[in-house]
Amino acid sequence: SQGILVRVLYDDIGSFLTLPKDYAKQLEGEGIQCSVFNPFRPILSSLQNNRDHRKIISIDGKVAFTGGFNLADEYINAIEKHGYWKDAGLMLRGEAAWSLTVMFLQMWSLSNHMQEDFLKYFPWGNAGCPENSDGFVLPYSDKPLDRENIGEHVYLQIINRAKNYVYINTPYLIIDDSMVSALSLAAKSGVDIRIIT
């Protein structure tokens, strides 16, 4: 109602048991653009396992949130559906936030079978990002239709370049031989390796 473009993109498999079938239409009735990524079809398909599990909130391309949290009452402990949940998330500003915006727009375009001009959402025009930071953030994403293991490659690079420590916190510790080798080699080189799962 305030003229702000609001888009919601959700994965059908993660939501089809909890959301009504006409949920996208309900949101559109409220002025929210809504798209369902890879809608579930009860037929055997090679694309059924191509899911989008990312959680991205982008605000004007300048601020973004990402992490493990979903939009559900149990994630803020308003209800206790599966016990008391703990999760983590990040708020990013500047160019890293813009990277997450592009990731969202790529999946939006894929889901809607269109190509959108991402630069029309670039928040700083020709001036460039005014945010200054002494930190470094490397947002990355993967596509469900390729065979590259981008996430694994990023983690292997991080582990292989570590000088002092690698701390990993994950509820799902599923590592292959190359990851075990990289962690072992880093530990033998004096890098402090800690994993909480």
List each model region and its residues.
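Charged, low-complexity intrinsically disordered terminal segments
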Residues: 1-197
